[in-house]
Amino acid sequence: MNLILMGLPGAGKGTQAEQIVAKYNIPHISTGDMFRAAMKAETELGLQAKSFIDKGALVPDEVTIGIVRERLSQEDCKKGFLLDGFPRTVAQASALEEIMKDLGKKIDYVLNINVDSGLLLKRLTGRRICKECGATYHLEFNPPAKADVCDKCGGELYQRSDDNEETVANRLEVNIKQTKPLLDFYEELGYLQSINGEQDINKVFADIDVLIGGLA
């Protein structure tokens, strides 16, 4: 099974990715992991990527796509993979189609975990962190026993500046705009599957499992 996982920040992609790879024993491939592995192995493309990253510059598409091609050609991807964080643009998605064609494979599904932006805002702005020990809480989903006080060490809880409502709302808006052309592209190809991410996390996985189970 060859899968792509999509979803806005706070949609619960990480949790679902863990469950998919654990059950189906396929590699979870994120852009960051690919870059790190290529740089560590000092491949030609890895060294090129490193030169851009060290300068604080974006890695050009041709380098990223080359690294993706190398990674998907590896032995552990023979039975499938879960791509996360790539592609990000229609140009990258088109390049991925070419890679898959060259490898004699195709993408089976693009799983988009759908969550209303209002709920995402609540999920992302509710996080609180202990100033002393770094423990993480959530006002709704994992609240401390006593408001603003860490259960573990009694330290004061605070909200990170980039978790405030305005910053999070802007981040979501940018993500929605960037993601829409990609979703349209995959819908046209017939790969796109929308998953209700507003349910309990086990129910979300059960829905994914029913969908992809036939591919195993």
Swiss-Prot record:
Pathway: Purine metabolism; AMP biosynthesis via salvage pathway; AMP from ADP: step 1/1. This is Adenylate kinase. The lineage of its organism: Bacteria, Bacillati, Bacillota, Bacilli, Bacillales. Catalyzes the reversible transfer of the terminal phosphate group between ATP and AMP. Plays an important role in cellular energy homeostasis and in adenine nucleotide metabolism. It catalyses: AMP + ATP = 2 ADP. Transmembrane segments: none annotated. Residues 30-59 are annotated as: NMP. NCBIfam families: adk, PRK00279.1-2, PRK00279.1-3, PRK14527.1. Zn(2+) binds at C130, C133, C150, C153. GO terms for molecular function: adenylate kinase activity; ATP binding; zinc ion binding.
